Amino acid sequence: MVLMIVSGRSGSGKSVALRALEDMGFYCVDNLPVVLLPDLARTLADRQISAAVSIDVRNIPESPEIFEQAMNNLPGAFSPQLLFLDADRNTLIRRYSDTRRLHPLSSKNLSLESAIDKESDLLEPLRSRADLIVDTSEMSVHELAEMLRTRLLGKRERELTMVFESFGFKHGIPIDADYVFDVRFLPNPHWDPKLRPMTGLDKPVAAFLDRHTEVHNFIYQTRSYLELWLPMLETNNRSYLTVAIGCTGGKHRSVYIAEQLADYFRSRGKNVQSRHRTLEKRKT
């Protein structure tokens, strides 16, 4: 397991790096005192979870010996790595001017420029022992996150999770949906008294819908549309793609089609989840 320690000058992108690491499955803690690193590692060791911790100028130890002692007390299951983010002085000044945030070392008697220089001196012991130093001066937020994924995972894309969810329009459109498809125009099993109490997960309902060409056409055209744009979506710094399929009540057509799409992309090796809002409400 990896214990990734993220440090660097304020404004260099530590928060961005921590979010990217969290997306990669790391358990992330912001600004944890160095002396607590061994305790955190021991807590996570039994759970087999890699961790990432940010350390800034406000919680660096008073002496390098304290940091070394904390590293020596880590459980053997963890491999510590120190990532140090930096940027040139003018870039840091510009970023602070753009965000209008206060530098951690700023005070009435210390200008932003002086605070940046002082911070650089205080962080030099960490910088000197870093396993990886990244200059973010010319990087965007997305480029930094992508670079970290490439270095740590060995591939350019992180795995996108495709979520197919069914819903009923009478209950409202899901607010987390990236795409919404309306299937209320398709043949409705609701009007068959035998099928009405069933759901799109039941075989008789599936057989009913499977008999209609327009259902097959809709599924084919929808999955073709998603396949066309999926490569770009996978490289667009997102963790989830939520596709919502809606019918009137969210019980028959939308459930069946959401499952069909989920099964198709799952068979193509994609990371897929499916959920059915109306059916979940009925269980509670």
UniProtKB/Swiss-Prot annotation:
Q: Does the keyword GTP-binding apply?
A: yes
Region ranges (RNA-binding): 266-284
Query: Keywords assigned by UniProt?
Result: ATP-binding, GTP-binding, Nucleotide-binding, RNA-binding
According to the UniProt entry, the coiled-coil residues are: none
One GO term in the molecular function aspect is: GTP binding
**Any idea which positions bind ATP?**
8-15
HAMAP family reported for this sequence? RapZ_like
Which family, according to the similarity comment? Belongs to the RapZ-like family. RapZ subfamily.
Q: What is this protein called?
A: RNase adapter protein RapZ
Gene designation: rapZ
